């Protein structure tokens, strides 16, 4: 292979102008459109002198074939020529004018002028590279200029001082902390925000002189839940009001029946009273069934004691004592049963 050889485009022009290869000719010399015979060896068979003289000449020119030394290989010559034609940037195929079938198959190509030649894919013009390098170099300079413009409004004292920039992840605020050794006591630990964020942030600053925060009891006053209806009914049954207790205290008297003490109100109520239902039935005590027997001869509340004062003592007391005794025994037995069941839970009245 020769060290220096002619490039393919001028070599093709020389071959076309020689008129030594059949089928190779100019179709439009002004537009540089030419025709190359392109036979298919697999279909029609190879005639080296008729179908492959151009491919053979290119193989000899590139040093791939030496006449009289190498065996003829028109198929390889054609493949090498096609690859060389496709790699040229200044020659393109005119596919609408090419005929690829038949005994007279040929291809039409056009040589492009310098103005229409596309640049190579792997290379870029120097101007684009230089512009890109300049653009990359100018970006840090612009950022530093923007930072200096943000501090340019300060006095010359701050401009001379060295500053450190804190870069935080996902931070859009540049914070410049000025050196503390060069500042007075009035401007120590001062932070200058060059680019404040769009969203305002509320920051609470407290000092030692500020008052202590309000206690939790002041922030959340004590609240008492309302009393349920069941509790109200229970309290009304078990706990008397002040007026009732004031009126009823002087009238309560103690009585001893079968070794147990009971209270009775002789002035306004019957002789013996059972404790209220609230004292027997509550939320924390088992449900009990209490039976109260009604008196056969109830005493009116507005009558004086003892009843039937007009009657003789012997006649009036005898039936009353005989009739009231079983009633008293019945009440006492009921109270005794209930007190034995509840024992410690029921307090004595």
Curated annotation (Swiss-Prot):
GO molecular function: DNA binding; DNA-binding transcription activator activity, RNA polymerase II-specific; DNA-binding transcription factor activity; DNA-binding transcription factor activity, RNA polymerase II-specific; RNA polymerase II cis-regulatory region sequence-specific DNA binding; RNA polymerase II transcription regulatory region sequence-specific DNA binding; sequence-specific double-stranded DNA binding
Gene Ontology terms: biological process: cell population proliferation; defense response to virus; immune system process; negative regulation of transcription by RNA polymerase II; positive regulation of transcription by RNA polymerase II; regulation of DNA-templated transcription; regulation of transcription by RNA polymerase II
Alphabetized SMART domains for the sequence: IRF
Variant or mutagenesis effect after changing residue 75 to R: Diminished acetylation by both CREBBP/p300 and PCAF. Greatly reduced enhancement of H4 promoter activity
Subunit structure: Interacts with BRD7, IRF2BP1 and IRF2BP2. Interacts with CREBBP in growing cells; the interaction acetylates IRF2 and regulates IRF2-dependent H4 promoter activity.
Similarity remark: Belongs to the IRF family.
This protein's name: Interferon regulatory factor 2
Native source organism of the sequence: Homo sapiens
Lineage: Eukaryota, Metazoa, Chordata, Craniata, Vertebrata
Gene that produces this protein: IRF2
């Amino acid at each position: 292979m020769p060290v220096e050889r002619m490039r393919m485009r001028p070599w093709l022009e020389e071959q076309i102008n020689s008129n030594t290869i059949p089928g190779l000719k100019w179709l439009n010399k002004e537009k540089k459109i030419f025709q190359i015979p392109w036979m298919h060896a697999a279909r029609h068979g190879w005639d080296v002198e008729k179908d492959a003289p151009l491919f053979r000449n290119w193989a000899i020119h590139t040093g791939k074939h030496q006449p009289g030394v190498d065996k003829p290989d028109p198929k390889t010559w054609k493949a090498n020529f096609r690859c060389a034609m496709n790699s040229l940037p200044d020659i393109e195929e005119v596919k609408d004018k090419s005929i690829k079938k038949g005994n007279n198959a040929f291809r039409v190509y056009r040589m492009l002028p310098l103005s229409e030649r596309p640049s190579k894919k792997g290379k870029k013009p120097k101007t684009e590279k230089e512009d890109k390098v300049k653009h990359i170099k100018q970006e840090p300079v612009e950022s530093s200029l923007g930072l200096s413009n943000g501090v340019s409004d300060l006095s010359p004292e701050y401009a001379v001082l060295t500053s450190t920039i804190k870069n935080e992840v996902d931070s859009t605020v540049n914070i410049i902390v000025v050196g503390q050794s060069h500042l007075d006591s009035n401007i120590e630990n001062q932070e200058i925000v060059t680019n404040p964020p769009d969203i305002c942030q509320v920051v609470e600053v407290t000092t030692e002189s500020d008052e202590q925060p309000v206690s939790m009891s002041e922030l959340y006053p004590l609240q008492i839940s309302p009393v349920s209806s069941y509790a109200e009914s229970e309290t009304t049954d078990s706990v008397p009001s002040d007026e009732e207790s004031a009126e009823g205290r002087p009238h309560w008297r103690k009585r001893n029946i079968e070794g147990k003490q009971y209270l009775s109100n002789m002035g306004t109520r019957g002789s013996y009273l059972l404790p209220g239902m609230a004292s027997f039935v509550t939320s924390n005590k088992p449900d009990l069934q209490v039976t109260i027997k009604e008196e056969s001869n109830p005493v009116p509340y507005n009558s004086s004691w003892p009843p039937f004062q007009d009657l003789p003592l012997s006649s009036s007391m005898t039936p009353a004592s005989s009739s009231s005794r079983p009633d008293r025994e019945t009440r006492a037995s009921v109270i005794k049963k209930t007190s034995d069941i509840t024992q410690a839970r029921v307090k004595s009245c």
